[in-house]
Amino acid sequence: MPASMFSIDNILAARPRCKDSVLPVAPSAAAPVVFPALHGDSLYGASGGASSDYGAFYPRPVAPGGAGLPAAVSGSRLGYNNYFYGQLHVQAAPVGPACCGAVPPLGAQQCSCVPTPPGYEGPGSVLVSPVPHQMLPYMNVGTLSRTELQLLNQLHCRRKRRHRTIFTDEQLEALENLFQETKYPDVGTREQLARKVHLREEKVEVWFKNRRAKWRRQKRSSSEESENAEKWNKTSSSKASPEKREEEGKSDLDSDS
């Protein structure tokens, strides 16, 4: 055998390199969108050798459909399936090196070529949890800690609106009649009334709580009105007393004359 077959170049050329065996990417007419705040930084925060190696393994492929949008920026910054980061809704395509096969997005299955950052293991990680897309326009996700991401998610989660019960006239009449009898009905009485008016006992209990609060407000306002009326009567009587005295004095003078 010729000695050239055992040269380093021939040996390395025969082995498939993970770096050069990325799945082919469909060409797109539009130029890919570049995010300046995300470009150049890896998911793990620091920009160095690990960042460049990771970017070499995973170049920015074009999203399926020919829209010209990157499915991953500097690694897997946007490579989470169906999550919003920045102003881009990413449908992550199964891209990856050929030595590992077509790999699903990070979080579902880890590729042996991609190192797992410490503190963010598996699909239960905070980074995999959906963060509202209004919160991360051009934001470096790798610089945020676990606590900061949790606080962002909690602050911007939409609160569920409570369903307000609409009572019929018959139900309101029955509830009001019982309220006139007792302000604090027991559980048995509430259950009996609930069966009568086709309501749940919890709804009856909430109605009585609200009705008692309204009754206390009305009672407080009526007492304040009565107190104000008494004060006004006292002040009006004190102002009218000198006039009455003058009239009484004039009447006394007339009687003397």
Swiss-Prot record:
Keywords: Developmental protein, DNA-binding, Homeobox, Nucleus. Residues 241-257 have a biased composition (Basic and acidic residues). GO terms for molecular function: DNA-binding transcription factor activity, RNA polymerase II-specific; DNA-binding transcription repressor activity, RNA polymerase II-specific; RNA polymerase II cis-regulatory region sequence-specific DNA binding; RNA polymerase II-specific DNA-binding transcription factor binding. The gene is GSC. Regulates chordin (CHRD). May play a role in spatial programing within discrete embryonic fields or lineage compartments during organogenesis. In concert with NKX3-2, plays a role in defining the structural components of the middle ear; required for the development of the entire tympanic ring. Probably involved in the regulatory networks that define neural crest cell fate specification and determine mesoderm cell lineages in mammals. Disulfide bonds: none annotated. SMART domains: HOX. It holds the Pfam family Homeodomain. Gene3D superfamilies: Homeodomain-like. InterPro entries: Goosecoid-like_HB, HD, Homeobox_CS, Homeodomain-like_sf. Residues 213-257 are annotated as: Disordered. Its main location: nucleus. Belongs to the paired homeobox family. Bicoid subfamily. GO terms for cellular component: nucleus; transcription regulator complex. This is Homeobox protein goosecoid. The keyword Lipid biosynthesis does not apply. It is found in: Nucleus. GO terms for biological process: dorsal/ventral neural tube patterning; embryonic skeletal system morphogenesis; forebrain development; middle ear morphogenesis; muscle organ morphogenesis; negative regulation of Wnt signaling pathway; neural crest cell fate specification; regulation of transcription by RNA polymerase II. Residues 160-219 bind DNA. PROSITE patterns: HOMEOBOX_1, HOMEOBOX_2.
